[in-house]
């Protein structure tokens, strides 16, 4: 993760607009623009608005010469909170459904990971994006986790984030459009965010304790992306093994997402942004191809096993789990337990095997 602590780009002399501002004013400008972007994305009901908004604001700042950087300690703490979020999101309820349907679930996940890895391999092979970036960026889920881990394995986090969050937006919007073919979701309202809920002292203390112990354990064990992975592993064991509940209030998540978004976005330069823009058609084509492939899997599952078409589509959708859950809850005939079990299984397997698959595909690209 040290790659995010880079010094300002050598391009800086030509980008003096923000560099001439005092650091306090740079932070203030970044905060205001982040709030505007995040608010606009929330109003548009786009996924991951609280992370994408600050990241877009930081990209604007970074490409205009901003010299401020998120301190490593704050970035590490933000990663630990995201690790707690991922650990807390894994429900023990998925395991009975997974046990009952494991051949189907495993087949779908393996097929999806294989397809996404092939697309990443092609983008890398054609030198559209550098190194292993495309392999990490093509991962079908766990977007924030993949971005956090990518830097530790030598990929360009900025371009990985660009690919991953573009996929999240495309997948979520496509799922919403497909759902409208089966059910009218126009009357369904997303519940408002309660920014400052009552604090459960025990659950909140457990969250902070897990973040501290998990982050330190990851550092001691020299894990890649130690604060995230250490907290995720430790938190998963405590949450699933001991039944300890964690509380992650929205204000804490918003701060953590902003730290992650700023850390990535502030390291964008105009050269990187131009590179991402040039690669945009191929990246969009790969996302559309992955969505179409998963749609084909859903069609096969629906026809061969008699599963409701919308249930099959939502279950096999490559990412956007939060948005998928909202859409599934809005449809009366959807088997939400099946959808969330398969989505959670894909998320968990991608998280566990993603780094190994990325290294394997990257090695074949170099050969």
Region spans (language model):
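Membrane-interface helix termini and inter-helical loops of multi-pass transporters
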Residues: 92-100, 181-199, 242-250, 274, ...
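Membrane-embedded alpha-helical segments of transport systems
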Residues: 141-146, 161-182, 293, 322-323, ...
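Cytoplasmic-side transmembrane-helix entry/capping segments in multi-pass membrane proteins
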Residues: 71-83, 102-107, 128-139, 161-166, ...
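Juxtamembrane and boundary regions of transmembrane helices in multi-pass small-molecule transporters
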Residues: 119-129, 171-190, 299-305, 348-367
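C-terminal transmembrane helix pair
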Residues: 290-295, 299-367
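Transmembrane alpha-helix boundary signature
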Residues: 67-70, 88-101, 117-132, 299, ...
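Structural signature of multi-pass alpha-helical membrane transport proteins
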Residues: 3-74, 78-94, 115, 198, ...
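Alpha-helical membrane segments and immediately flanking helix-loop junctions
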Residues: 126-166, 309-343
């Amino acid at each position: 993760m040290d790659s995010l602590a880079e010094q300002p780009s050598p391009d800086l002399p030509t980008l003096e607009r923000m560099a001439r501002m005092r650091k306090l004013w740079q932070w203030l400008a970044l905060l205001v623009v982040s709030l505007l972007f995040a608010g606009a994305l929330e109003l548009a009901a786009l996924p991951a608005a609280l992370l994408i908004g600050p990241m877009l604001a930081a990209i604007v700042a970074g490409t205009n010469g901003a010299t401020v950087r998120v301190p490593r300690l704050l970035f590490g703490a933000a990663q630990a909170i995201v690790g707690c979020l991922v650990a807390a999101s894994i429900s023990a309820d998925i395991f009975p459904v997974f046990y009952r349907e494991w051949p189907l679930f495993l087949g779908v996940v393996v097929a999806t990971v294989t397809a996404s890895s092939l697309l990443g391999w092609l983008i890398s092979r054609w030198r559209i994006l550098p190194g292993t970036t495309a392999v990490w960026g093509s991962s079908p889920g766990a977007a924030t986790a993949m971005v956090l881990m990518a830097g530790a394995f030598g990929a360009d986090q900025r371009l990985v984030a660009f690919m991953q969050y573009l996929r999240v937006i495309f997948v979520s919007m496509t799922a919403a459009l497909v759902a409208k073919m089966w059910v009218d979701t126009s009357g369904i309202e997303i519940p408002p965010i309660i920014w400052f809920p009552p604090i459960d002292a025990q659950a909140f203390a457990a969250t902070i304790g897990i973040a501290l112990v998990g982050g330190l354990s990851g550092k001691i064990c020299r894990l890649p992306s130690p604060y995230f992975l250490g907290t995720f592993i430790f938190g998963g064991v405590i949450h699933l093994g001991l039944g300890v509940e964690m509380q992650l209030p929205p204000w804490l998540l918003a701060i953590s997402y902003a730290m992650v978004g700023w850390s990535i976005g502030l390291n964008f330069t105009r050269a990187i942004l131009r590179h991402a823009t040039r690669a945009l058609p191929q990246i969009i084509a790969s996302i559309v191809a992955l969505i179409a492939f998963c749609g084909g899997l859903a069609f096969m599952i629906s026809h061969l096993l008699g599963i409701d078409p919308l249930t099959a589509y939502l279950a096999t959708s490559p990412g956007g789990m939060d948005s998928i859950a909202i859409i599934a809850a809005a449809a009366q005939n959807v088997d939400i337990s099946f959808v969330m079990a398969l989505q959670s299984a894909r998320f968990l397997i991608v998280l566990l095997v993603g780094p190994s698959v990325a290294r394997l595909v990257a090695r074949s690209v170099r050969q």
